[in-house]
A protein has these predicted regions:
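Helix-to-loop junction immediately C-terminal to a conserved catalytic motif
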Residues: 102
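Conserved coupling/switch loops of ABC nucleotide-binding domains, chiefly the family-specific signature
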Residues: 108-111, 161, 261, 293
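Non-catalytic connector elements of ABC transporters
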Residues: 36-39, 289, 299-409
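ABC ATPase nucleotide-binding domains
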Residues: 124-130, 134, 138-284
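The feature captures the beta-strand-to-loop junction immediately N-terminal to the Walker
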Residues: 87-89
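ABC ATPase nucleotide-binding domain
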Residues: 56, 77, 113, 396-398
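Conserved ABC transporter NBD signature motif
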Residues: 110-118
Length: 409
């Protein structure tokens, strides 16, 4: 297979919205070439969305070796002021998309736009984008104030205005008294606040964050999650945030793009992503999820019947199954399952055996064997009247059909 022709794509300006547009014509074909008719239909839709998008990826592809794609036909648009998180496992393509937006990687095909303007050929330092990294990237030989002054000096901002902007940025992150210190004299959380202030000091419309809280302890990480989110909304800036931490994604974002194998598997607000996953990957990657394997025996509209592999039949909501006889993976969240349930006549009831009962402070976590699955989890609140189950104990489990989703096997 021939090598892909490089097309220079430097970073995006501030306030981006994400899209992805497909390959351009050239003498050589990309590793995968989209169907022309489908491409034209999608391109028409993308053009319409691009008119209102602040950040847009339009059919963007990325290959490092000219053979395989690490980002595949990515189409993503963001309105101004949105906080969007790119979430996925290692190698899913999320960080590559962020780097293309910043201008540190070039798109092999497709176009990236900021506020309606193509930025593929704009170098990173001219895109006007603020960036925050996990390693802070502070200059150790400079004071905090000097670190914040650097991006302002590059932009040739005068001394009096620089001082005003530095003070305002430090006050925003509650670090106004630390301007004279060096990074080595600060804690990890303080350094991250300074890194955030430096990204905001020149007032960008778009800020990119690459695993910014990954090196911090749990308590500090949770505190900064809320600070960053509140600050972004207060300032009205657009944020593209990359993480593999599901909790960060669900608590901080207006929308989450779940990546796998170079594609967005689902793009949705956090509650929709968790409550209504569109495929088995998203269901299992976001939060904790119980699965039962089976075969569709009936399907009509928004309801189907699934025969589990142990022979029992249950009702479910069909998501991406369409035919009788199709194999499916039933998805049920642990908190939607009750032990010895009182859910009414519509509830599904299955026999189960307790394998493990774990005390977790505010909740109990019970692992059971259900319909051939020995790792079926039930989460219950720690109440004064809570009965503590014992390994080997036989119990009945129940859940409502609306909480049961039939996904791709």
């Amino acid at each position: 297979m021939g090598h892909l022709p490089p097309i220079r794509a430097h970073g995006l300006p501030s306030g981006l919205r994400l899209w992805i547009v497909g390959p351009r014509e050239s003498g050589r074909k990309p590793p995968t070439r989209p169907d022309v008719r489908r491409h034209n239909r999608e391109r028409s839709l993308l053009d319409t969305e691009a008119d209102t998008a602040f950040v847009a990826f339009e059919r963007v592809q990325k290959s490092y070796d000219g053979e395989s794609l690490v980002v595949k036909d990515l189409n993503l648009s963001m309105p101004k002021g949105e906080f969007l998180t790119m979430l996925g496992p290692s190698g899913s393509g999320k960080t590559t998309c962020l780097m293309m937006l910043a201008g540190f990687e070039t798109a092999t095909y497709g176009e990236i736009k900021l506020d309606g303007n193509p930025i593929n050929n704009i170098p990173p330092h001219k895109r006007g984008i603020g960036m925050v990294f996990q390693n802070y990237a502070l200059f150790p030989h400079m004071t905090v104030a000097e670190n914040l002054a650097f991006p302002l000096e590059v932009r040739k901002i005068g001394k009096s205005e620089r001082e005003e902007k530095i003070k305002r940025a430090l006050d925003m992150v509650q670090m106004g008294a630390f301007g004279g210190r060096r990074p080595a004299q600060l804690s990890g959380g303080q350094q991250q606040r300074i890194a955030l202030a430096r990204a905001l000091v020149f007032e960008p419309e778009l800020v990119l964050m690459d695993e910014p809280l990954g090196a911090l302890d749990k308590q500090l990480r949770e505190s900064l999650q809320f600070e960053i989110t509140n600050l972004a909304h207060e300032l009205g800036i657009t944020v593209v945030y990359v993480t593999h931490d599901q909790t960060e994604a669900l608590t901080m974002s207006d929308r989450v793009a779940v990546f796998d194998d170079g594609r967005i598997q689902q793009l949705a607000p956090p509650d929709e992503l968790y409550e209504r996953p569109q495929n088995s990957f998203v269901a299992q990657f976001i939060g904790e999820n119980n699965t039962l394997e089976g075969t569709v025996t009936q399907i009509a509209g928004d309801a189907c019947v699934v025969r589990l592999d142990n022979g029992e039949e249950i009702d479910a909501t069909p998501v991406n199954v369409a035919e009788v006889g199709e194999r499916t993976l039933i998805s049920i969240r642990p908190e939607r399952v009750e032990v010895d349930p009182e859910l009414g006549p519509d509830a599904h009831v299955l026999k189960a055996e307790v394998k493990e009962f774990i005390y977790m402070g505010d909740t109990f976590r019970t692992r059971l064997s259900v319909a051939g699955n020995d790792d079926f989890i039930v989460k219950t609140r720690n109440r004064a009247d809570q009965v503590r189950l014992k390994p080997g104990q036989q119990v009945t489990l129940g859940w409502l059909p609306r909480d049961c989703r039939a996904l791709d096997a």
